[in-house]
A protein has these predicted regions:
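Terminal, non-catalytic domain-edge segments
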Residues: 63-133
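Eukaryote-skewed repeat-based solenoidal scaffolds used as protein-protein interaction platforms
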Residues: 1-64
Length: 133
């Protein structure tokens, strides 16, 4: 459950006006690295929703370009071929898929989110590109 609390902290950092583009990229990279790693856990305590809040908070700042966001999302859909052959990678795949779903739902539900339609389309593309086999 520590990941959920870490996600809350990342959301506060992402909201800070003192955090620049490089800082937001570091947050997104850390989230990607955590989600891609093989794990013994399926996240069932709201970790995906809380990470999604951090991600969408970073997106809402409009500090990152749509191309930067697209590139970040694209790494989620790559590298899953044969993930189903390893239990840890299978769990990582489902955790990542659930995170992308949570980001998509959060994007659609936040009122007045800048670039909402563009972000939603990018997230949907990343979700539909994920293939574990």
């Amino acid at each position: 459950h520590a990941l959920a609390h870490t996600a809350d902290t990342l959301m506060v950092f992402a909201r800070s006006p003192h955090l620049d583009e490089a800082g937001l990229i570091r947050i997104l990279k850390a989230i990607y690295e955590k989600m891609q790693a093989a794990t013994g856990w399926i996240y069932v305590h709201g970790e995906d929703d809380r990470l999604a809040r951090a991600v969408v908070t970073a997106f809402a700042r409009e500090t990152l370009t749509l191309d930067q966001i697209k590139n970040w999302l694209e790494v989620f859909s790559a590298g899953w071929k044969n993930a189903w052959t390893d239990e840890g990678q299978t769990r990582a795949y489902f955790n990542t898929r659930n995170l992308l779903r949570a980001i998509h739902i959060r994007t659609l539900s936040v009122k007045d989110l800048p670039r909402k339609e563009e972000l939603s389309a990018l997230i949907l593309d990343a979700m539909t590109s994920m293939r574990p086999f």
